[in-house]
């Protein structure tokens, strides 16, 4: 009979693999002390029963935004006060209703049950603020909220209506331009402070990896050249620390598979191929269903080739928006799902582009009529394999 002993006794280059997880928050966040101090200075008044400024935090994926905010939340919660920070991932809580319900459930447990309307939940928010409570609502990937203008207006209006207490918004976004899509009323009501997280340099990534190697690997288990290579490869891409950590973790797993007691450059090179597919799969598998069907349609057409490929002005690999929508409708019928309207389809494309899964561009003058051209952001074979497995496994 198989038991766990052989796995527990197995030699490994790892000492504590969880240290390499993107969810792990180290005691010290290198190269983010300045941003952490700045954010803390803006929200400190909340701990003295004063409303703090709204904050928008920008930066590419893997620049330490979420990790820094969670570190701040740890420190915030150590101080006894009427203030609380509420963290929400807007890929999950992607509407005004979901955001308000999630925040208010912490004060009014009965809201856990379905069936409460938005006006009732809003009244509970006002009641909470009137109890001299101070809230900071952290909206990670704030761009993913469908009715963001309504949400911002509602949250800022609550301050005026309650008369006491205070609610502040802390938005986190990968897109510096996301505010351009807000209506003037929302922009005006925010009155926010903006903080930017720059991508890590090669040298900074080296130091971050060295810190995690010390905590997560056995002594002398990772060659310095492997750390340097992982940092250099990551800096070439986009300075994403999460990518660098995943690269190192995969390299360690490969070394274990080979029964080696150290990680070298060859393991990092092999890990690079696996990690790229892993990251694409993670992003795709967390997509809402209709987004995933849209992406599946694009991948399928990309493999089969556009029927308009021979048109003048049609760049290689690009598809016309209309043919993608037709394929999306076919995929929906095949899956026995009701296709959404063109308006919703365009929203899906915008979201997929924001995640780097597709590239869109207006058509050139050589193509009759004005349309949007669409291209996958990754290899069609990889994307199709992931989406096809998701729907037809």
Task: Briefly describe each language-model feature range.
Residues 1-52, 75:
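A short, basic N-terminal segment
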Residues 4, 8-14, 21, 52, ...:
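Mid-core helix/loop region of P-loop NTP-binding domains shared across ATPases and GTPases
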Residues 55:
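Conserved beta-strand position immediately N-terminal to the Walker
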Residues 58, 85-94:
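A short hydrophobic beta-strand->loop->alpha-helix junction that borders the nucleotide-binding pocket
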Residues 58-83:
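P-loop NTPase Walker A phosphate-binding motif
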Residues 254-280:
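Conserved C-terminal helix/linker of AAA+ ATPases
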Residues 277-315:
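Short alpha-helical segments that sit at the start of domains
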Residues 306-393:
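Terminal-proximal interaction/regulatory segments of ATP-powered molecular machines
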């Amino acid at each position: 009979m198989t038991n766990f002993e052989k796995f527990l006794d197995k030699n490994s280059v790892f000492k504590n693999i969880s240290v390499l997880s993107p969810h792990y928050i180290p005691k010290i966040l290198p190269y983010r002390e300045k941003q952490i101090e700045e954010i803390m200075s803006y929200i400190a008044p909340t701990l003295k029963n004063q409303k703090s400024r709204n904050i928008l935090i920008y930066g590419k994926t893997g620049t330490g935004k979420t990790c820094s905010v969670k570190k701040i939340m740890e420190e915030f919660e150590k101080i006894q006060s009427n203030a609380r920070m509420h963290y929400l991932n807007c890929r999950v809580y992607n509407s005004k209703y979901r955001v308000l319900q999630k925040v208010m459930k912490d004060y009014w447990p009965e809201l856990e049950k379905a069936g409460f309307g938005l006006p009732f939940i809003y009244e509970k928010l006002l009641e909470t603020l009137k109890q001299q409570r101070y809230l900071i609502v952290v909206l990670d990937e704030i761009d993913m909220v469908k009715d963001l203008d309504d949400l911002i207006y509602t949250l800022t209006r609550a301050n005026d209506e309650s008369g006491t207490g205070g609610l502040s918004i802390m938005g986190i976004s990968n897109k510096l331009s996301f505010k351009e899509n807000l209506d003037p009323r929302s922009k005006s009501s925010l009155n926010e402070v903006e903080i930017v997280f720059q991508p890590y340099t090669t040298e900074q990534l080296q130091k971050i990896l060295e810190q995690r190697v010390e905590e997560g690997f056995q002594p002398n288990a990772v060659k310095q050249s492997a750390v340097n290579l992982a940092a250099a490869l990551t800096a070439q891409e986009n300075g994403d620390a999460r990518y660098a950590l995943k690269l190192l973790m995969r390299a360690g797993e490969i070394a274990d598979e080979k029964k080696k007691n150290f990680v070298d450059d060859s393991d990092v090179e092999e890990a690079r191929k696996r990690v790229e597919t892993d990251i694409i799969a993670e992003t795709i598998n967390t997509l809402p269903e209709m987004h995933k069907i849209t992406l599946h349609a694009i991948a399928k057409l990309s493999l089969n080739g556009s029927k308009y490929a021979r048109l003048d002005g049609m760049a290689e690999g690009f598809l016309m928006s209309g043919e993608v929508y037709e394929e999306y409708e076919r995929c929906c019928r095949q899956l026995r799902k009701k296709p959404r309207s063109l308006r919703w389809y365009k929203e899906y494309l915008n979201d997929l582009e924001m995640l780097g899964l597709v590239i869109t561009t207006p058509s050139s003058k050589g193509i009759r009529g004005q349309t949007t051209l669409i291209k996958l952001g990754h290899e069609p074979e990889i994307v199709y394999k992931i989406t096809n497995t998701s729907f037809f496994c």
